[in-house]
């Protein structure tokens, strides 16, 4: 018993702490690293706040699309984005950027609008949000306006107050 107390006091002296200040588990006092401090998770947005946030992101992102500003548009996508398109297949960030640049070059008058009443927003716990809607693309072809609707699901990740798209599923073209 006496040797255990002696070892404890020796370890305590070597660790530079006092018995009153010792708040970490015994394992930490024996040389194990202390666990990292948890980063506080921001308070989740209310359902209405989340909806308004994603609706605003949709408006801003597609303003960049309609302006054919590829760099500004791609700022909304995470570097590790996976874009699944029913006609074009799976693309990564670079391929998606190249596809938008080609689209804007081939159809310089293309525009996108959100179909009114189609926007749905759902929280993704400890991650961000799902953004589901129907969109309408229009451009002039052979002297006439050509429009078509498609559907999409976007998964937005929120990190340090910044929202980025990590997954896109675009379908029903």
Give the residues covered by each predicted segment.
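Short, low-complexity N-terminal intrinsically disordered segments enriched in polar/charged residues
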Residues: 22-79
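A solvent-exposed, acidic/Ser-Thr-rich amphipathic alpha-helical stretch
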Residues: 48, 52-53, 70-127, 136, ...
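Short beta-strand edge/turn micro-motifs at domain boundaries
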Residues: 22-35, 149-173
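Short hydrophobic/aromatic-rich beta-strand segments that constitute the beta-sheet cores
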Residues: 83, 131, 165-167
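Exposed beta-sheet edge and beta->alpha loop/turn motif
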Residues: 127-161
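Positively charged n-region of N-terminal signal peptides that target proteins for export
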Residues: 1-5, 21-22
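Bacterial N-terminal signal peptides
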Residues: 6-16
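A generic structural motif
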Residues: 84, 138-140, 171
């Amino acid at each position: 018993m006496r040797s255990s107390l002696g070892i404890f006091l020796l370890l305590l002296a070597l660790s530079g702490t006092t018995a009153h200040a010792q708040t970490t588990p015994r394992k930490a006092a024996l040389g194990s690293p202390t666990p990292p401090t948890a980063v506080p998770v921001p308070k989740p947005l209310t359902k209405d706040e989340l909806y308004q946030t994603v609706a605003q992101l949709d408006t801003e992102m597609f303003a960049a699309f309609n302006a054919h500003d590829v760099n500004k548009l791609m700022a909304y996508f995470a570097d590790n984005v996976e874009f699944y398109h029913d006609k074009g297949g799976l693309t990564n960030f670079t391929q998606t950027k190249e596809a938008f640049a080609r689209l804007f070059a081939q159809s310089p008058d293309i525009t996108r609008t959100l179909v009114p009443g189609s926007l749905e927003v759902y929280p993704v716990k400890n991650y961000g949000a799902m953004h589901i809607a129907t969109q309408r693309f229009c451009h002039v072809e052979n002297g006439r306006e050509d429009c078509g609707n498609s559907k999409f699901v976007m998964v937005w990740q929120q990190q340090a107050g910044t929202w980025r798209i990590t997954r896109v599923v675009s379908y029903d073209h």
